[in-house]
Amino acid sequence: MVTMKLFALVLLVSASVFASDDDDKKDDIGTVVGIDLGTTYSCVGVFKNGRVEIIANDQGNRITPSYVAFTPEGERLIGDAAKNQLTSNPENTVFDAKRLIGRTWNDPSVQQDIKYLPFKVIEKKTKPYIEVDIGDQMKTFAPEEISAMVLVKMKETAEAYLGRKVTHAVVTVPAYFNDAQRQATKDAGTIAGLNVMRIINEPTAAAIAYGLDKKEGEKNILVFDLGGGTFDVSLLTIDNGVFEVVATNGDTHLGGEDFDQRVMEHFIKLYKKKTGKDVRADKRAVQKLRREVEKAKRALSAQHQSRIEIESFFEGEDFSETLTRAKFEELNMDLFRSTMKPVQKVLDDSDLKKSDIDEIVLVGGSTRIPKIQQLVKELFNGKEPSRGINPDEAVAYGAAVQAGVLSGDQDTGDLVLLDVCPLTLGIETVGGVMTKLIPRNTVVPTKKSQIFSTASDNQPTVTIKVYEGERPLTKDNHLLGTFDLTGIPPAPRGVPQIEVTFEIDVNGILRVTAEDKGTGNKNKITITNDQNRLTPEEIERMVTDAEKFAEEDKKLKERIDTRNELESYAYSLKNQIGDKEKLGGKLSSEDKETIEKAVEEKIEWLESHQDADIEDFKAKKKELEEIVQPIVGKLYGGAGAPPPEGAEGAEETEKDEL
């Protein structure tokens, strides 16, 4: 194959890339929020009045579990409420969507994960889909839809704080996420009703959070980001507000949950050895253990041992064991040590020595593990990592700063972000060779072109196969997409000139064009990993579903509230009838019996009609009121009598009691 290099053009990001929208558009987008969409926890921040605010959710927590649950009544819970019912409803509590998003069903990591997930994961269109039971009806969700629900929660958290609608966001992803995973994350934003203006790498966001006030001279910063499910290392230089990612490496499938899993395996084996019972098949028992193991792991960051106590763990038996820090480290030492290799790789790729690193920034909850801190310190010959940043909030903080830049906020100063593509991009040439067009760690956005030709005489079509990966042969790399350029005029091999152009935008999304220079005939593909990506129709359907869910949630809440009103009214009457100090001592036995009978009737009706609709609950409450109010009215000598406690109007009387 004849190849002729045409040109290689690298575009550096300048401030104008971020502020390219005209002023009118800035007014339209409102406040842009920064969202850290994590595997286990998510966090949202906003740049306001010259500083970043990390926003607490409705439970007062600054980080929200990335959990979605569906109750037997069909109610949808997101965040803390969802995580709280993991042990009682494991099959319908979904988490770890980030470990599935943008991956194919056959991906070994997906196959490994589904062994441990308590909910059902099925294959649909070569992708993993989640199947849950929503009020007696099975429903499947794409991982993007689950992530979208978490994003909706973050959006609502920001809206409650700001007091207005939020429509635009910056969302972070692990630096080592490939194109399909990035695109799927963007799709999740669309389903959640968010315009994702920028996808940025988590370590880059953390470096922004750390380095925003570092104005003096050039600094080399190593960001070590170990979260609940992913691990990234990035090396950045910061020079007077210009952030350049020099190299990045990591593992999109390593984090705190893997450490928990090792401890769980240990205790499951230990329990079997002691009792002869295998608890693996009991999802509730396994989730109880997961919850307590996570608590113990957190405790071990501050103390040397932690007791794990679970009442009625399995078949009525309790569980009681001690986990020491030494045992925790022993169970995970190979995983801990494996985090050091990407650090060394990043140093090698940057042509830097350990001594050239000015700051080490630790990000992600798992960097609180003392052994991880020790290993990082030892690798850098005793250099202390920087402590001035909350590892849980750093990524959202940096995303919020970037969001401030996109909002056109003047207080962000001259911040410029130079990010890189994490993997080499190229095409397949004769013999299955990977011909590289964009080497990994190239600053984005970027555009590279190269001239190729035909491999045989009178070849009418060339097939362009686009790959990402570092191996010399394409069979060992990851196929991103394929397209044909047809209509090449007959000519001897090597004569036609086919120009292939790779262009990556600021979100790391790739467009590939092939042009026959002789005829001007062109074809192009935007790499969105078609087999793995949602179609526009699917996204539209999911957006509609998400809106429908929000509407259903509202209706369901109304129905539950109406049911609760009837229930609390009935039980309030029952208590008062049974209390001689209250109604019980004031009514004739006949009236008392009438009310008791009516109340019992309604309580029995409630027990057998849990799924009745709003109108039924209202009607039953009215029936009860029509029996009770005339009787109570007699006590007070007329129809103007105050209603009993728990009846309509009770809210007012409660406030006015003397």
Curated annotation (Swiss-Prot):
SUPFAM superfamilies: Actin-like ATPase domain, Heat shock protein 70kD (HSP70), C-terminal subdomain, Heat shock protein 70kD (HSP70), peptide-binding domain. It is an enzyme of class 3 (hydrolase). Residues 410-420 are annotated as: Interdomain linker. Belongs to the heat shock protein 70 family. Monomer and homooligomer; homooligomerization via the interdomain linker inactivates the chaperone activity and acts as a storage of hspa5/BiP molecules. Interacts with DNAJC10. Interacts with dnajb9/ERdj4; leading to recruit hspa5/BiP to ern1/ire1. Interacts with ern1/ire1; interaction takes place following interaction with dnajb9/ERdj4 and leads to inactivate ern1/IRE1. Endoplasmic reticulum chaperone that plays a key role in protein folding and quality control in the endoplasmic reticulum lumen. Involved in the correct folding of proteins and degradation of misfolded proteins via its interaction with dnajc10/ERdj5, probably to facilitate the release of dnajc10/ERdj5 from its substrate. Acts as a key repressor of the EIF2AK3/PERK and ERN1/IRE1-mediated unfolded protein response (UPR). This is Endoplasmic reticulum chaperone BiP. It comes from Xenopus laevis (African clawed frog). The lineage of its organism: Eukaryota, Metazoa, Chordata, Craniata, Vertebrata.
